From Swiss-Prot:
Residues 22-541 are lumenal. GO terms for biological process: protein folding in endoplasmic reticulum. Residues 163-331 form the SUN domain. Residues 1-21 form the signal peptide. GO terms for cellular component: cell periphery; cytoplasm; endoplasmic reticulum membrane; membrane. May be involved in membrane protein folding. Required for localization of MPS3 to the nuclear envelope. Residues 91-108 have a biased composition (Polar residues). Keywords: Endoplasmic reticulum, Glycoprotein, Membrane, Signal, Transmembrane, Transmembrane helix. The chain crosses the membrane at residues 542-562. This is Uncharacterized protein SLP1. Residues 63-90 have a biased composition (Basic and acidic residues). It is found in: Endoplasmic reticulum membrane.
Length: 587
């Protein structure tokens, strides 16, 4: 019974291994179908089947048949796979719709390039506007009291009328009268005054009372001996200014008055190499009055002003200075002036644009409605016509320089200093104020931010267009690839069905052969088991015999051991008695 159970267990184990191998081959085939690797599937499956179902018996003819069938299937599948790959490559390498490289609407430009393009587009607008040439108007359409202006234009009354013009003149007269009545207490601000925290930084050692020059008092003055080798004074101004005017005075009698002096400025002190910026050398009059000296080229924003006395009138002992005043333009003043100029230029440009934007057709229609009293219009003799028409123009005539100011500003934004042919030095342009630099930076940031927003919008539009084109192209490619994939999959499925049928037949044959081999194997093992049973019974008998012999031997040993112990005890007792006798004898 035990032998039969063992045999049935072996058969069940072999069948489980075979089914597991078949399932593994099927899963491998299903996993590799999508990758078009059918050749690997066929070879792997045949080898796996042959490895799993290999038997001790030789099946050489069957294996050669399997390899031939597999090689034929591999060749056909390789041809189909090559055709599919060629189709896929043709689909992937299809040329996209060509783009015009010069078209900026379809190309991605950098921010700087895009900014240049936009600036050209904006600048082309006024150029087109300025390039228009007006046709001459026929003077026969003028009335009797109308005359021709400097630009061959007449007053049509669309900007001003008589009432408005008279009101404007009256307002201007009233304003001028009020301005004359007003009392002005102080026209300029003295930046070298002690009231606005101006101080004396340095003077020559012989000078006494240098701070008195900052106070408007005739009783206090800077006292300096005329024999001093260097006579100078350094004043720290209230603010950083462009020095435009200096007033200096000596009210003291019986003293020498300064004759020539040098004015220098600086933006910091102490200086590294005493690099003062010289504004000029001036010559004063020999008088006891406040003398003014204009600075035509301020050059830098000055925080410190230095006055050096070079020569004097007369030969008195003391050469005093009673008062020093410094006038100029601060950074905030210059900023406000620039703002006002920009606003005036803007208003003037708006006015000129309004005049230039008049429609010629409207003027011609207006002229047609005007009654003409000239019998024979003579366009060539304009001087006689102007003399006959004695009237005054209602519009204020625009000067030639003012008319072309906007046009010149568009073509010449930066004024360049033209060097004269004489040997005089070129005046240095004053540096810009911090407020002007800040406003320039802010305006640049504002323009850049607005341009950045528009740039991002345009780039997003370009991206959306390009994404749409890419989506359409990928849709076409994907549909083409899907058709090719379906064709290849159907062909591969047909080949796999054929291969599965062949594999099924081969596996059935192999299983039948394996069954026969298993039967032979079980019979052989049954014979071996019978022999083992006989040997086990014989060994059992030998074990029983050896066991009984061992038990007898142990019993014999135990019996003989008891006699030995008794003899040993007797000899031991005799030895002890002999030892006692010997000890007693010794004593």
């Amino acid at each position: 019974m035990a032998n039969r159970l063992l045999i049935y267990g072996l058969i069940l184990w072999v069948s489980i291994i075979g089914s597991f191998a078949l399932d593994r081959n099927k899963t491998a085939q299903n996993a590799k179908i999508g990758l078009h690797d059918t050749t690997v599937i066929t070879t792997g499956s045949t080898t796996n089947v042959q490895k799993e179902h290999s038997s001790p018996l030789s099946t050489g003819s069957l294996r050669t048949h399997d390899f031939r069938q597999a090689s034929k299937v591999d060749i056909r599948q390789a041809d189909i796979r090559e055709n599919g790959e060629r189709k896929e490559q043709d689909a992937l390498t299809q040329p996209a719709t060509p783009r015009n490289p010069g078209d900026s609407s379809n190309s991605f430009l950098s921010f700087d390039e895009w900014k240049k393009v936009k600036s050209k587009e904006h600048s082309s607008g006024p150029e087109r506007h300025l390039s228009r040439v007006r046709e001459p108007v026929d003077p026969s359409c003028y009335k009797e009291k109308e005359c021709i202006g400097e630009e061959l234009e007449i007053d049509l009354g669309f900007l001003t009328n008589k009432n408005e013009w008279s009101e404007r003149e009256e307002n201007q007269k009233g304003f001028n009268e009020e301005k004359d009545i007003e009392k002005v207490y102080k026209k300029k601000f003295n930046y070298a005054s002690l009231d606005c925290a101006a101080t004396i930084v340095k003077s020559n050692p012989e000078a006494i009372g240098a701070t008195s020059t900052l106070i408007e008092s005739k009783d206090k003055y800077l006292l300096n001996p005329c024999s001093a080798p260097q006579q100078f004074i350094v004043i720290e101004l209230c603010e950083d200014i462009l020095v435009e005017e200096i007033e200096i005075a000596n009210y003291e009698f019986f003293s020498s008055t300064f004759k020539r002096f040098r004015v220098s400025v600086s933006d910091r002190i102490p200086m590294v190499k005493n690099e003062w910026t010289i504004l000029g050398e001036f010559e004063a009059r020999n008088s006891r009055e406040l003398q003014k000296f204009q600075i035509h080229n301020p050059q830098i924003w000055a925080s410190y002003l230095k006055i050096e006395i070079l020569s004097h009138y007369e030969d008195e002992f003391y050469c005093p200075i009673s008062l020093i005043k410094v006038y100029g333009k601060s950074m905030m003043d210059e900023f406000k002036i620039d703002q006002l100029k920009a606003q005036e230029d803007k208003e003037q440009s708006i006015g000129t644009n309004n005049i230039n934007n008049l429609n010629e057709q409207n003027i011609q229609d207006r002229c047609n409605n005007i009654e003409t009293r000239l019998e024979t219009p003579n366009t060539s003799n304009l001087s006689d016509l102007a003399g006959a028409l004695s009237c005054t123009s209602k519009l204020i005539p625009l000067k030639f320089d003012e008319f072309f100011k906007v046009l010149n500003a568009s073509f010449c934004p930066s004024k360049q200093m033209i060097s004269s042919s004489s040997s005089s030095a070129v005046p240095v342009i004053p540096e810009e104020s911090i407020f002007k630099n800040i406003m320039k930076r802010l305006s640049q940031l504002e323009t850049n931010s607005s341009l950045t927003v528009s740039y991002i919008e345009e780039q997003s539009k370009l991206l959306s267009k390009s994404f749409e084109q890419l989506e359409m192209a990928h849709e076409a490619k994907f549909s083409h690839l899907v058709t090719i994939f379906n064709e290849t999959m159907m062909s591969n499925l047909d080949l796999l069905n054929n291969f599965a049928n062949q594999l099924k037949d081969q596996s059935l044959r192999i299983l039948e052969e394996q069954k026969l081999e298993n039967d032979k194997f079980t019979n052989r093992h049954l014979l071996h088991l019978e022999r083992l049973e006989k040997e086990v019974s014989f060994q059992r008998r030998i074990v029983y015999a050896s066991f009984f012999a061992f038990v007898g031997l142990i019993s014999y040993l135990l019996i003989t051991r008891e006699l030995y112990f008794e003899d040993f005890e007797e000899s031991k007792n005799g030895a002890i008695e002999k030892a006692d006798i010997v000890q007693q004898a010794i004593r």
